[in-house]
Amino acid sequence: MENMQIRTMKVTDYEKVYALWMSCKNMGFNDIDDSKEGISRFLERNPNTSFVAMENDELQGIILGGHDGRRGYIYHMSVAEKHRKKGIGSSLVEKCLASFKNEKISKVALLVFKYNEAGNSFWEKQGFILREDVNYRNIELCELVRIDT
């Protein structure tokens, strides 16, 4: 982590980011929102809240965060398996949360699959509280192909 730098994500990072996402277990994606075009739209709307951890030209981790002006959301967070347990994930979360604070966002939410034990443990250590008083619901407005890793 000596030469690791965290910087805002750019659409030119997409190929490396997508490859990292596909290498991580227990994550959910889809063919529209997580396509290069979908991520490009997302980054245009949220240019300052997603980050990559790089060392030289190697992608070590990524956090995809955005907000609607009221609430922040962390959509994906991944660290390459060989770089885990080095504080990279925590550093990415810290940077993302600071960017939300800078944009006057007061609350941040995220979703983690129930069976993703490592992910749930990580987010609990980051201070994210499990809400058991709400049901999460969604509706697809177009046909999406799920890509679960």
Model segments located where?
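Conserved acetyl-CoA-binding loop-helix of GNAT-fold acetyltransferases
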Residues: 85-98, 125
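A short helix-loop-beta-strand connector motif used in the catalytic cores of GNAT acetyltransferases and
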Residues: 40-52, 73
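Conserved GNAT acetyl-CoA-binding A-motif
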Residues: 100-111
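A conserved beta-turn-beta hairpin within the catalytic core of GNAT-like acetyltransferases
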Residues: 66-75, 84, 130-132
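A short, internal acetyl-CoA/4′-phosphopantetheine-binding micro-motif in the GNAT/acyltransferase core
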Residues: 77-84, 112
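Conserved beta-strand-loop-alpha-helix junction that forms the acyl-donor binding cleft
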Residues: 110-119, 138
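Conserved beta-strand in the GNAT
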Residues: 52, 58-66, 73-78
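A short beta-loop-alpha structural element at the N-terminal edge
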Residues: 4-17
